[in-house]
Curated annotation (Swiss-Prot):
Belongs to the DXR family. Mn(2+) binds at residues 148, 150, 219. SUPFAM superfamilies: 1-deoxy-D-xylulose-5-phosphate reductoisomerase, C-terminal domain, Glyceraldehyde-3-phosphate dehydrogenase-like, C-terminal domain, NAD(P)-binding Rossmann-fold domains. HAMAP family: DXP_reductoisom (MF_00183). GO terms for molecular function: 1-deoxy-D-xylulose-5-phosphate reductoisomerase activity; manganese ion binding; NADPH binding. GO terms for biological process: isopentenyl diphosphate biosynthetic process, methylerythritol 4-phosphate pathway involved in terpenoid biosynthetic process. The gene is dxr. Keywords: Isoprene biosynthesis, Manganese, Metal-binding, NADP, Oxidoreductase. It holds the Pfam family DXP_redisom_C. This is 1-deoxy-D-xylulose 5-phosphate reductoisomerase. The keyword Manganese applies. InterPro entries: DXP_reductoisomerase (IPR003821), DXP_reductoisomerase_C (IPR013644), DXP_reductoisomerase_N (IPR013512), DXPR_C (IPR026877), DXPR_C_sf (IPR036169), NAD(P)-bd_dom_sf (IPR036291).
Length: 394
């Protein structure tokens, strides 16, 4: 099953599957519903039995698009529609669910896949971050295979030792399009500038999260949850070339780094094929050519998101859900031109502070997470409106 099939992760996963028909067979696809033509084309090429869309209003258009793709007499796939369509699909019969949905709406499908006993290839980091204790309570050892390039790298490097052998995890960051700029220089950057990522081709929300380094903050929380390494032993370094995807430093002083040219098909292949490797899943280095690999410390003043993420990760409970939801609203406001770039983290910080002590412990429920998210989104919207009004008067 591929959830989020028309997005960046989904389309690259399908490319990998089509190049390896002897290894993979896809039985279902899900998408939000904004690209029904592409969804219908994917369904036909993969011969899936079920497609799911979040938007019920696009079902007639989707059915028409499917009819145009399939020949006379060919049975059309079953269509699931509605807010819980992807969750239904995630729980249906298959071996592996690739969750490539963007945002915390991926939580319910993640929980459904785990509860149904599926192997979860997890690209939707938000579901683990906002539902940490809930996800970990359901997941059996080895059931979650991370698809983020950084966590796929850690996943492979950690196999070289035991948890007791690990001194620290080193998560690398490209630094985004604004690497080297000061906080003052970031004040007036535009969405167009922020969307021009120097290394990776991603969707708009993830690209902005990479520009603010919120994405890296989320990855620090994710690394803590996946590998049970304390936050003080998870380090972030800037690596502009994005060749080294993460590193593990062991207690004997050795460091294992996983390195490939930046191409998400590599981590996707790990998620779908593990414990086997998929030959030629992504390009390899030409080691006969000279290249420079640079590493720099993180500028926490210009990019306070990683420090804030550590803070909410340590608070745990509903705090990560508040952080993520507020950020999603602020990113939307920035893309719409109603919030300045630096205003994203300023607003998220204020929402986290106003949230106060999060609800934590074994009593945490999905309802608690959703309630915290709803409050955070509403409060973030209020604050972005106040910011826009103040700037208009200035």
């Amino acid at each position: 099953m591929i959830l989020g099939s028309t997005g960046s992760i989904g389309t690259q996963a399908i490319d990998l599957v089509l190049r390896n028909p002897d290894r993979f067979r896809v039985t279902g696809l899900s998408a939000a519903g904004g690209r029904v033509g592409l969804l219908a084309e994917q369904a036909h090429r993969l011969r899936v039995s079920t497609v799911a869309v979040a938007r019920e209003d696009v079902v007639p258009v989707l059915r028409e698009a499917l009819t145009a793709q399939y020949g006379p007499g060919e049975p059309l796939p079953e269509i699931l529609a509605g807010a819980d369509a992807a969750t239904q699909l995630a729980a249906s019969d298959c071996h592996t669910v690739l969750n490539g949905i963007t945002g915390s709406i991926g939580l319910a499908p993640t929980l459904a896949a785990l509860e149904a006993g599926r192997t979860l290839a997890l690209a939707n980091k938000e579901s683990l971050i906002v539902g940490g204790p809930l996800v970990k309570a359901l997941a059996k050892p080895g059931q979650i295979i991370p698809v983020d390039s950084e966590h796929a790298a850690l996943f492979q490097a950690l196999a070289a030792g035991t948890r007791a052998d690990v001194r620290k995890l080193v998560v690398t960051a490209s630094g985004g399009p604004f690497r080297g700029r000061t906080k003052a220089e970031l004040a007036n950057v535009s969405p167009e500038h922020a969307l021009a990522h120097p290394t990776w081709a991603m969707g708009p929300v993830i690209t902005i999260n990479s520009a603010t380094l919120v994405n890296k903050g989320l990855e620090v929380i994710e690394a803590h949850l996946l590998y049970d390494i304390p936050f003080e032993r998870i380090e972030v370094v800037v690596h502009p070339q994005s060749y080294v995807h993460s590193m593990v430093e062991f207690t004997d002083g050795s460091t294992l780094a996983q390195a490939t040219p930046p191409d998400m098909r590599g981590p996707i292949a790990i998620g779908l094929g593990w414990p086997e490797r998929v030959p030629d899943a992504a390009p390899a280095f030409d080691w006969t050519k000279a290249s420079s690999w640079e590493f720099f410390p993180l500028d926490n003043d210009a990019f306070p998101s990683v420090g804030l993420a550590r803070h909410v990760g340590q608070l745990a409970g509903t705090a990560p859900a508040v952080f993520n939801a507020a950020n999603e609203e602020c990113v939307d406001a920035f893309l719409n031109g109603t919030l300045p770039f630096n205003g994203i983290m300023e607003t998220v910080t204020r929402v986290v502070e106003e949230h106060g002590t999060p609800r934590t412990g074994t009593s945490l429920t999905v309802a608690d997470v959703l309630e915290a998210e709803t409050w955070a989104r509403a409060r973030a919207r209020e604050l972005t409106v106040q910011t826009a009004t103040a700037e208009a008067r200035a």
